[in-house]
Amino acid sequence: MLAKHSKLFFTGSVVFLIVAIVLASWGFPKIISTRIQKSIQLENSSMMYDKWVKLPIPLIFKVYFFNVTNAEGINEGERPILQEIGPYVYKQYRERTVLGYGPNDTIKYMLKKNFVFDPEASNGLTEDDDVTVINFPYMAALLTIQQMMPSAVAMVNRALEQFFSNLTDPFMRVKVKDLLFDGVFLNCDGDSPALSLVCAKLKADSPPTMRPAEDGVNGYYFSMFSHLNRTETGPYEMVRGTEDVFALGNIVSYKEKKSVSAWGDEYCNRINGSDASIFPPIDENNVPERLYTFEPEICRSLYASLAGKATLFNISTYYYEISSSALASKSANPDNKCYCKKDWSASHDGCLLMGVFNLMPCQGAPAIASLPHFYLASEELLEYFEDGVKPDKEKHNTYVYIDPVTGVVLKGVKRLQFNIELRNMPRVPQLQAVPTGLFPMLWIEEGAVMTPDLQQELRDAHALLSYAQLARWIILAAAIILAIIATITVARSTSLISWPRNSNSVNFIIGPMVNDKMR
């Protein structure tokens, strides 16, 4: 009877050990991580869904201007001396309108941004401040005309003298709010055939930074970001992650197209990555070397490269930052060759220096993007300036800290600078003596830091995983101990081990030795 019970005990212990091994090696971590990952999938019932539709906290949008301090000297051939003014800080609220769901685990939506000035965070700077910056639309118009019809540059410039008020040099003296959102008025009311041609061109094909005046006024308003404020963009189509959580957030189409058309090349036209608001969890066995985001404002995807692990807010994260290869010249990164476009002259292949990126094919204007202060760009660009342009990794880098368990961004910053060529043109009075070079207007920073409440939620999720890790080893250890006890019990009951009768554990060890001596 004892042997039968011992065998049952042994069998149960072995089964428990097998179950414990399965739970320890796969079950507990998988169960907990699956529960956590299910909460981040874009389903109506998930914890993430409402936060994704309407961000619970605003992003922080900062603007820094390159104020020109020696405009008169530049007009006489001096190298530019610039003064960085900023940040002008805005709260950027984001809200999505869900349009429906696709057959391949996708969700379709429109994205709306709303910018609200934050005077407290701006530390005394106001939107009524005056700045002197490069005249972006003026230079864009002349560069475009010089490319299309060089002989017409002087005539068009006379028209532009009516289009712009007080056009004495290639610089604008404007208020911050007008340059960013309200708009700088450009006049189309005149009898010049060239002016009519310029305004007709704008009416037929105006860049997003230009909007027509209202209430019967004949003209346009130029602003850098008005087209992004309180207007919906899209539709975007994004993977929901309910079938494959590691594909969560990947954009599969934008404006009903699965690729952009700006670059005339399959690789460069590819839509790749997320909209930077949501990322998939990171598979610890297959950590991606690059993290892609799709940027519709520049018609391309950019990537940040894995820099390693980092601890932030007492949470282990993966740290990604933009690398020189992302905006490298074609000689340094042949993959970037397809971003070269002929936009200035027939003799120019459109391939720019290291660290700068041509926006003409995307925006319809000869603007050039870079990282702030030409960080990671060619040293040649810095030689153009007397002072005021000083790249600094800490201030000008783009980076993100990603929680591998949820894919949530703990902290992230995206930075971009807008430039245009200031070109010497002998037939244009305003440009007869200026030095030719790439001139920055402003740079922006868009970022967010996880709030303390959300940090605690994330730490709790990590703690749950840690408890599961601890529990699986405790259960495994208990199962092993139980299996050993069961083995000994079965062995004793079946006399596999010679157990002395009527002896306790101590007698079992020392008894025979004592008995021998007594003999």
Curated annotation (Swiss-Prot):
Q: What is its main location?
A: membrane
Its record classes its membrane topology as: Multi-pass membrane protein
Provide any one GO MF term from the record. scavenger receptor activity
TM stretches of this protein: 8-28, 470-490
Q: Which residues lie on this side of the membrane: Extracellular?
A: 29-469
**Localization per Swiss-Prot or TrEMBL:** Cell membrane
**Sugar-bearing residue positions:** N44, N67, N104, N166, N229, N272, N314
The function of this protein is:
Plays an olfactory role that is not restricted to pheromone sensitivity.
Annotated disulfide bonds? C268-C338, C299-C362, C340-C351
Protein's name according to its UniProt entry = Sensory neuron membrane protein 2
State a single Pfam family of this protein. Answer: CD36
Q: Which residues lie on this side of the membrane: Cytoplasmic?
A: 1-7, 491-519
Report where it is expressed, by tissue. Localizes to both male and female antennae but not the leg, wing, gut, head or thoracic ganglia. Detected throughout the sensory epithelium, associating with both sex-pheromone sensilla and plant-volatile sensilla. Differentially expressed among different sensilla and different neurons within a given sensillum.
What the record says about family reads:
Belongs to the CD36 family.
Keyword set includes Cell cycle = no
GO terms for biological process, alphabetical: sensory perception of smell
Keywords (alphabetical) are: Cell membrane, Disulfide bond, Glycoprotein, Membrane, Olfaction, Receptor, Sensory transduction, Transmembrane, Transmembrane helix
Q: Which organism is it from?
A: Manduca sexta (Tobacco hawkmoth)
Q: Which GO terms describe its cellular component?
A: cytoplasm; plasma membrane
